[in-house]
Regions:
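Conserved glycine-rich cofactor-binding loop
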Residues: 18-19
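Conserved glycine-rich Rossmann-like NAD(P)H-binding loop of the short-chain dehydrogenase/reductase
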Residues: 32-49
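The beta1-alpha1 cofactor-binding region of Rossmann-like NAD(H)/NADP(H)-dependent oxidoreductases
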Residues: 43-44, 64-76, 107
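Substrate-binding pocket helix/loop in short-chain dehydrogenase/reductase
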Residues: 101-102, 109-114
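Active-site helix of classical SDR
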Residues: 125, 161
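Residue(s) in the substrate-gating loop at a strand-loop-helix junction
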Residues: 145
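C-terminal helical subdomain
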Residues: 181, 185-186, 193, 205-246
Length: 246
């Protein structure tokens, strides 16, 4: 496992950082020495997160915006360069959930979910990659889902967005490996976040379930990003002990 100085010379950009997995991932990287750029739409939450990181002796800055807006992606990468002179790791975590049958899903809802989960991943990666190529290396992780590995009834559009992330990452691995850039996906099962609500699940039932804590997923993300230079993790599935493997 990474120690307190593993990422001391690294600058990390985390999208969807105002809660859940993104929040815990930013805290975890900062706790291991990384300089962190965080982004999401809720500015008050980002400010709270950065204040917490700084209070613990870390370095963090934020940019509030919609991850599906290209200007947000551009500004976040530029902020990393301005404040930390580099960008080493991109965690594409921004996203949304949807638990609806196909016949209850509108075209507008399809577009919104695809924008949140896939377009945001494309935009941030598109703006981060030139920086990483210039640096002769970097790492990009997509926080997908077990819903990207198999289809679940009542989640067709959500599954489609997560399958898209995995395919995108697999293609990029082939494109970017020659530049020293590692690309992979993390596929969590059930996690105690706001996106777990639905299909009869309430906030209380989620909190009392055996679902993964966001912090546990963050630990898997840091593990994937702390591999030796000559090895990479292409895909990692993380499930809680009460969840079947398939």
């Amino acid at each position: 496992m990474p120690d307190a100085s593993t990422f001391s010379r690294k600058a990390v950009l985390v999208t969807g950082a105002s809660a859940g997995i993104g929040w815990e991932t930013a805290l975890a990287f900062a706790g291991k020495g990384a300089s962190v750029v965080v982004t999401a739409r809720r500015e008050n939450r980002l400010r709270e997160l950065c204040d917490l990181i700084v209070a613990r002796g870390g370095k963090a800055v934020y940019f509030a915006g919609d991850a599906a807006d290209e200007a947000t992606a551009y500004q976040c990468v530029a902020l990393a360069i301005k404040k930390f002179s580099r960008l080493d790791i991109l965690i594409n975590n921004a996203g949304a959930g949807n638990y609806k049958n196909l016949i209850d899903t509108s075209a507008e809802e399809y577009d919104s979910l695809m924008d949140s989960n896939m377009k945001s991943s494309f935009l941030f990666t598109r703006h981060a990659v030139p920086v990483m190529i210039q640096q002769n290396g970097g790492e990009i992780l997509f926080i997908s889902s077990v819903a990207g590995l198999q289809g679940y009834p009542g989640e067709a559009v959500y599954c489609a967005t997560k399958v898209a992330q995995i395919g995108f990452a697999q293609a990029l691995d082939g494109e970017l490996r020659k530049h020293g850039i590692k690309v992979g996906t993390i596929c969590p099962g059930g996690v105690k976040t706001e996106f777990a609500l639905g299909k009869g699940r309430t906030a209380a039932s989620v909190q009392h379930s055996h679902m993964l804590e966001p912090k546990e997923v963050a630990e898997a993300i840091l593990f994937a990003c702390s591999q030796p230079a000559n090895s990479r993790i292409l895909q990692m599935t993380v499930r809680h002990m009460g969840e079947p493997g398939r």
